[in-house]
């Protein structure tokens, strides 16, 4: 079964034969039509007590840095949503109010990222007049991040492939109220034109070639932060203000059809 922060996508059913002489039982998997395969590398589930767990097959450890700036909101669709409310938006060296997914020792995770991946967020944003808070990132001399450029109100997906390779949506105009966005960044593992794509609310908004080649460079700090960007050990930079319901990483380049299905599922 899929995570309980999304619709059920598959179910396993056991069938036993009626034969008395040779009763047999077998399992079959029933798949929801049009379903998107689950995220292979990270699928975050937020819990009522402020902890979080990874429902993907990778089962990455997720460490919560609790504090008054991090709270949970119960939600009928997602179970619980994480709310980040830092004292100072975009602050560096914060020590509470975020999560860390450390992959320093996980070479399988690193190799999966290195040859192409997708990041998915369902996140709120608002015009706070600040510069570039990050809802999820592993950035700094390499890595990747999704950034809310709230000085001009647009989203950026920026993997480091030869150099920083920012892919930006067009400006969204005024965003005076907290607004939900489905943001998906994709890199297909190549150095070709259109290898990097950025989708917003189910539609492609930008694409480009990597800055140079097709070699993904990891930063020194090999961990993702949810609610900010990777900083020093047990710290986060670029503190984010908003709510996050979905945070996933896929070991593949999602297609336009898959991204649209993911967005449509959220809107059901």
Name what the model sees in each region.
Residues 1-7:
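Short, surface-exposed loop/turn segments at beta-strand-coil junctions that are enriched for proline
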Residues 7-19:
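A short beta-strand micro-motif common to beta-rich folds, especially ectodomain repeats
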Residues 22-35:
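C-terminal edge beta-strand
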Residues 34-91, 206, 260-268:
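Extracytoplasmic low-complexity segments
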Residues 37-42, 48-56, 88-157, 190-195, ...:
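Extracellular glycan-recognition modules
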Residues 208-243:
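Flexible glycan-contacting loops in extracellular carbohydrate-active proteins
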């Amino acid at each position: 079964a899929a995570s309980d922060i999304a619709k059920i996508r598959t179910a396993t059913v056991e069938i036993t034969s009626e034969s008395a002489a040779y009763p047999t039982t077998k399992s079959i998997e029933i798949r929801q039509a049009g379903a998107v395969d689950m995220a292979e590398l990270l699928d975050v589930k937020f819990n009522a007590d402020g902890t979080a767990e990874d429902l993907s097959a990778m089962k990455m450890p997720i460490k919560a840095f609790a504090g008054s700036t991090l709270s949970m909101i119960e939600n009928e669709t997602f179970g619980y949503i994480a709310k980040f409310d830092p004292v100072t938006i975009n602050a560096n060296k914060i020590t509470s109010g975020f999560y860390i997914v450390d992959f320093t020792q996980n070479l399988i995770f690193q190799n999966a990222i290195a040859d192409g991946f997708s990041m998915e967020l369902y996140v709120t944003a608002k015009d706070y007049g600040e510069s570039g808070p990050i809802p999820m990132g592993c950035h700094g001399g390499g890595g990747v991040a999704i950034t809310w450029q709230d000085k001009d109100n647009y989203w950026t997906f920026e993997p480091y492939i030869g150099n920083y390779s920012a892919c930006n949506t067009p400006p969204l105009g005024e965003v005076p109220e907290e607004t939900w966005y489905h943001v998906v960044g994709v890199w297909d593992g190549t150095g070709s034109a259109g290898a990097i794509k950025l989708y917003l609310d189910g539609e492609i908004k930008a694409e480009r070639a990597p800055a140079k080649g097709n070699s993904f460079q990891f930063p020194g700090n090999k961990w993702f932060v949810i609610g900010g960007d990777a900083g020093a050990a047990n710290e986060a930079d670029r503190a984010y203000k908003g709510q996050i319901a979905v945070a996933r990483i896929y070991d593949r380049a999602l297609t336009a059809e898959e991204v649209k299905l993911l967005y449509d599922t959220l809107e059901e």
